[in-house]
From Swiss-Prot:
InterPro entries in the record: PyrdxlP-dep_Trfase, PyrdxlP-dep_Trfase_major, PyrdxlP-dep_Trfase_small, Ser_HO-MeTrfase, Ser_HO-MeTrfase-like, Ser_HO-MeTrfase_PLP_BS, SHMT-like_dom
CDD domains referenced in this protein's UniProt entry, alphabetically: SHMT
GO MF: glycine hydroxymethyltransferase activity; pyridoxal phosphate binding
Family statement: Belongs to the SHMT family.
Reactions listed under catalytic activity: (6R)-5,10-methylene-5,6,7,8-tetrahydrofolate + glycine + H2O = (6S)-5,6,7,8-tetrahydrofolate + L-serine
UniProt keyword Plastid present: no
Annotated positions for site Plays an important role in substrate specificity: H229
Parts of the chain that traverse the membrane: none
Protein encoded by which gene: glyA
Keywords: Amino-acid biosynthesis, Cytoplasm, One-carbon metabolism, Pyridoxal phosphate, Transferase
Protein's organism: Marinobacter nauticus (strain ATCC 700491 / DSM 11845 / VT8) (Marinobacter aquaeolei)
Protein name as it appears in the record: Serine hydroxymethyltransferase
Length: 417
């Protein structure tokens, strides 16, 4: 029999020490990885609940196991809230991740060998948008569009020309490193012109979309998929939304289960339900507005300090800094900033001359620092400190000074107060 006072501490000290160290790192370091955020204690409470014990293959009311009456309530809540939050006719909350959500969409809409048109990973797309090393580029015939080299913006004329030439079965609109708005209406017009499905991967901007501060893809797309973390600030997981098409919805359900997954993670689905309820609040809308303001403030400082920001700025939660002009690798910049307790990720920039393991850029995002309570003033200061380090990459005194400034601001803005 288990007792409620069973703890990891004292039982598995190696693991407990690592968990404690990670909590301290999160509190003492500034997090600027665009795909990371902090979940609320409510979300973590759901994830740590007894719902993790329940197997529930199938869907609410149509399970393959008994005893699902209460987890059915949790999943029904998550589905209803997702549909309300995004104004969608259909929601599947079972995908374990964004990549598995995307995989299910491919499986539902395509046959092996069908042509897909997606954004090049080298220009800001995602592995699951047709990269050759991913299932999406191995099982399907992938054609890639990119950014205009002069403007740093998506070239919709190129997208249309490629669509007309290759006649894809599905066009993917979405990104992992693009700082501007997407024209979903134009994407849909192109898809309709060639008889393709439009699939939108809004994993990075779902929270912004929910708050009405980024264009809404749901009215334009046949299918939308997203993660539930990142800007949405929920548990790590996936979500699929779709239009009012019963046949399409059945295909999507079958592609998730039994096509790609077995039992859903009911504790994570409960956490998704919590996340969606949090996202309906006025506080969440204000948070998303601040995320965008903070990203713009940081990008402005980098530009003022002489750094090239890809696409000329940002209209969402992230931006890319090109370090080609400074002859600094993304790998070295990442390491130097990390020493100062500023966590970013090295990232390829369009037409990057260096390998993906080295890169010539940094991807910077503001969801996590905004959760801490940073506003424009703190973000401008932070961007200035980062520029100081990048301008003096080998100067330990500069790095040490910035680390002290980081420690002070983190103490003022704790993650979990």
């Amino acid at each position: 029999m288990f007792t409620r006072d069973m703890k990891i501490a004292g039982f598995d000290d190696e693991l407990w020490n690592a968990m404690q160290a990670e909590e301290k790192r999160q509190e003492a370091h500034i997090e600027l990885i665009a795909s990371e955020n902090y979940t609320s204690p409510r979300v973590m409470e759901a994830q740590g609940s007894v719902l993790t014990n329940k197997y529930a293959e199938g869907y609410p009311g149509k399970r393959y196991y008994g005893g699902c009456e209460f987890v059915d309530i949790a999943e029904d809540l998550a589905i209803a809230r997702a549909k309300e939050l995004f104004g969608a006719a259909y929601a599947n909350v079972q995908p374990h991740s964004g990549s598995q959500a995307n995989s299910a969409v491919f499986m539902a809409l395509l046959k092996p060998g069908d042509t897909v048109l997606g954004m090049s990973l080298a220009h800001g797309g995602h592995l699951t948008h047709g990269a050759s090393v991913n299932f999406s580029g191995k099982i399907y015939s992938a054609v890639q569009y990119g950014l205009n080299p002069e403007t740093g913006l998506i070239d919709y004329d190129e997208v249309e020309a490629l669509a007309v030439e290759h006649k894809p079965k599905m066009i993917i609109a979405g990104f992992s490193a693009y700082s501007q708005e997407l024209d979903f209406a134009r994407f849909r017009a192109i898809a309709d012109k060639v008889g393709a499905y439009l699939f939108v991967d809004m994993a990075h901007v779902a929270g912004l979309v929910a708050a009405g501060v980024y264009p809404d893809p749901v009215p334009h797309a046949h299918v939308v998929a997203t993660t539930t973390h990142k800007t949405l600030r929920g548990p790590r997981g996936g979500l699929i939304l779709a239009c009012d098409d019963e046949d399409l919805q059945k295909k999507l359900n079958s592609a998730v289960f039994p096509g790609g997954q077995g039992g859903p993670l009911m504790h994570v689905i409960a956490a998704k339900a919590v996340c969606f309820k949090e996202a309906m609040s006025d506080e969440f809308k204000a948070y998303q507005q601040q995320v965008v303001k903070n990203a713009a403030a940081m990008a402005e400082v980098f530009i003022e300090r002489g750094f090239d920001v890809v696409s000329g700025g940002t209209k969402n939660h992230l931006f890319l800094v090109s370090l080609i002009k400074q002859d600094i690798t993304g790998k070295d910049a990442d390491a130097a900033l990390g020493k100062a307790h500023i966590t970013v990720n090295k990232n390829a920039v369009p037409n990057d001359p260096r390998s993906p393991f080295v890169t010539s850029g940094l991807r910077i995002g503001t969801p996590a620092v905004t959760t801490r309570g940073f506003k424009e003033a703190e973000c401008r200061n932070l961007a200035g400190w980062m520029c100081d380090i990048l301008d003096n990459l080998e100067d330990e005194a500069v790095n040490s000074r910035v680390r002290e400034q980081v420690e002070a601001v983190c103490a003022r803005f704790p993650v979990y107060g």
